[in-house]
Amino acid sequence: MAFKIIASQCTQCGACEFECPSNAIELKGEKYVIDPKKCTECKGVFEIQQCASVCPMPKTCVPA
């Protein structure tokens, strides 16, 4: 299962985009989105999902 970004909570800071090891996050229009085909939930790379760990807004990057 991939992660998703709750658009209404996202501040568009961009921290998640730069931390994603699979380059699954990009800015589309005025919101960041996670490509579910690219998202690996950081498995095999990190113990926790990097998007969720760097996001300044709690529970904005969540399981899809």
Swiss-Prot record:
Which Gene Ontology terms describe the biological processes this protein takes part in?
Answer: nitrogen fixation
Q: Does the keyword Cytoplasm apply?
A: no
Keywords on this record? 4Fe-4S, Electron transport, Iron, Iron-sulfur, Metal-binding, Nitrogen fixation, Plasmid, Repeat, Transport
Q: Where does [4Fe-4S] cluster 2 bind?
A: 20, 39, 42, 51
Q: Which cofactor does it need?
A: [4Fe-4S] cluster
Q: Which GO terms describe its molecular function?
A: 4 iron, 4 sulfur cluster binding; metal ion binding
Boundaries of every 4Fe-4S ferredoxin-type domain copy: 2-30
Q: Does the keyword Electron transport apply?
A: yes
According to the record, cofactor stoichiometry and binding are noted as: Binds 2 [4Fe-4S] clusters.
- Detail which positions bind [4Fe-4S] cluster 1: 10, 13, 16, 55
Q: Which domain of life is it from?
A: Bacteria
Q: What is this protein called?
A: Ferredoxin-like protein in nif region
